[in-house]
């Protein structure tokens, strides 16, 4: 089995998991940004290299305001993986980039979404979620306010729902996924909790 992962960077726990999967006979290919990244938090130490194939590709901020790998359709056409694993915000490309859907369909690749569910509002409960879990920037200024913010969140929720409908499964950092993802139409058997663990059976 050949699995292609996209990451903004590779922290130690992901590196250990990828090495373990490679040792078990899974052919792992990882793509990460050619120059730095915009999706990994400050202070998170990155790992360079492993036993798996690690390549870089240009990352670009797209018209919808999030980072993406524009060359991902060409990468998939060349690598021909059985499974493509993408996390936030890269899985938004499934919605915004028809060429990506076409490339995956042409090689029968299954989509798996890596999610941080405790940062995802339940579908249809955006206002309630952000009232209970306010969003702040690094200067602790409140971001979750105003019509513009809630409109963006509503649109994002609908795009998430579309992307989840294309996925064969989800990998999640937290058991909160069992409470949140079904609201987007994800079946319980498609929800897999990995935590930040090197234990691939977790």
Map each language-model feature to its residues.
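N-terminal subdomain of nucleotide-sugar transferases
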Residues: 1-56, 79, 107
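Hydrophobic anchor at the start of a short beta-strand
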Residues: 3, 28, 111, 188-191
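Generic beta-sheet signal
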Residues: 6, 31-33, 112-115, 173, ...
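An aromatic- and histidine-rich active-site surface loop
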Residues: 11-15, 38, 83-107, 111-129
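An amphipathic, basic-hydrophobic alpha-helix
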Residues: 57-102, 106, 153-162
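Nucleotide-sugar donor phosphate/pyrophosphate-binding loop at the beta->alpha transition
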Residues: 110, 119-162
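Donor nucleotide-sugar binding/catalytic pocket of nucleotide-sugar-dependent glycosyltransferases
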Residues: 149-161, 165-202
């Amino acid at each position: 089995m050949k699995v292609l992962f996209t990451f903004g960077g590779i922290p130690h726990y992901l590196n250990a998991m990828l090495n373990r999967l490679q040792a078990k006979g899974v052919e792992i290919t990882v793509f990460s940004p050619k120059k730095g990244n915009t999706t990994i938090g400050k202070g998170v130490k990155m790992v360079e290299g492993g036993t798996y194939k690690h390549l870089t590709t240009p990352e670009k901020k797209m018209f919808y305001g999030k980072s993406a790998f524009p060359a991902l359709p060409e990468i998939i056409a060349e690598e021909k993986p059985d499974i493509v694993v993408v996390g936030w915000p890269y899985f938004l490309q499934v919605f915004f980039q028809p060429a990506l859907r076409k490339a995956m369909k042409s090689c029968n690749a299954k989509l798996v979404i890596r999610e941080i569910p405790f940062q995802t509002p339940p579908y249809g409960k955006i206002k309630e979620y952000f009232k209970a879990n306010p969003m702040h920037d690094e200067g602790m200024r409140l971001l979750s306010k105003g019509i513009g913010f809630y409109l963006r969140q509503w649109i994002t929720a609908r795009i998430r729902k579309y992307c989840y409908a294309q996925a064969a499964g989800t990998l999640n950092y937290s058991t909160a996924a069992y409470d949140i993802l079904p609201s987007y139409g994800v079946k319980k058997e498609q929800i897999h909790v990995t935590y930040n663990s090197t234990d691939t059976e977790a």
